[in-house]
């Protein structure tokens, strides 16, 4: 059995927000890679990996579950974003090693394929209804069957200018204001327009990004019921998940939730009480393949489907880990798409192929994806990577922050 000899990190993308874990073994040429990317705390993730690495040196790389449990408890306090990310990156790398050692793709080790390809949904957006319609039609022509629809940025449709908002005389200088009532008016109008123009052929989704107050969130879910969404995403923040009981009592609009989840006690009640229809944990924030396959199995018995979170700040390795889970899981529902630049694809040979609304894995052993370290490091802009990044703040008229 191969033994772990070193754990390395490769920081890449222009802003340095991608962290790729590389686990080396005592068998020549046998290593695995995983995703430990964090858009806002990449340097913290790297430091944590360096702290945990001595615990794992000399361990059997095939003892994946045991190593997962060791990392989970090694700092006593657990279930936090950084630790989960570190845990996930190492876990993916160990599954990659296991697959290479066995000579088969990871999805085969997880029980074999339950489908030939992974259906993905596209991200359509526009600053006005016509631009959004055009973008939706473009994705339909590309073959996508499920398309997310947004009016501009997250919260779009709910932003009003300072004059409309009637800011207090001592306001803090914010010029763009998020208003719940504007959102409740404009998003149903958006879907009414799209259904009138496109009919009910395309399956449509929308991401609230947790911008609404809970009672208004319930109202929105009810207002969107006539438009038969594929799902309504992140209607409520993790702190307010108990409101999903009221959402379920009030309407049948399918709910997708979990992008910010890091703790089992966030997703477990929503799944076991059937309060959501899709769970959207990010594989690299949910503890990796080992833990996310357990989430997928739990979903299977309660009629909930998976929709692992991807989006623009994820990397090709995390995407590939999600694809392996999707292929092997009977509770799979849909996979969020992710587009990368040509030079980013070039740095990750063997990446998943996105075509016609489907993601395709390859038949190579392990995850089937590798990292070209020279090309990956060439993507890094040292000046940009030295900066700190923070989640953008949206505010209400009185200056209070809207939780993203």
Task: Describe each region flagged by the PLM.
Residues 27-102, 398-403:
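Metal- or metallocofactor-binding catalytic centers and their adjacent structured scaffolds
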Residues 367-404:
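Extended hydrophobic packing segments that form well-structured cores
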Residues 1-14, 20, 99-100, 104-116, ...:
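N-terminal amphipathic alpha-helix/helix-capping segment at the start of soluble metabolic enzymes
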Residues 23, 47, 52, 66, ...:
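Shared catalytic-loop signature of beta/alpha-barrel
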Residues 4, 29, 52, 90, ...:
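Conserved, mostly hydrophobic/aromatic
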Residues 117-245:
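Metal-dependent enolase-superfamily TIM-barrel catalytic cores that perform enediolate-based chemistry
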Residues 1-38, 340-346, 398-404:
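Structured beta-strand/loop patches that form or line metal/cofactor-binding pockets in enzymes
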Residues 13, 28, 63, 101, ...:
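Ligand-binding pocket scaffold of soluble enzyme catalytic domains
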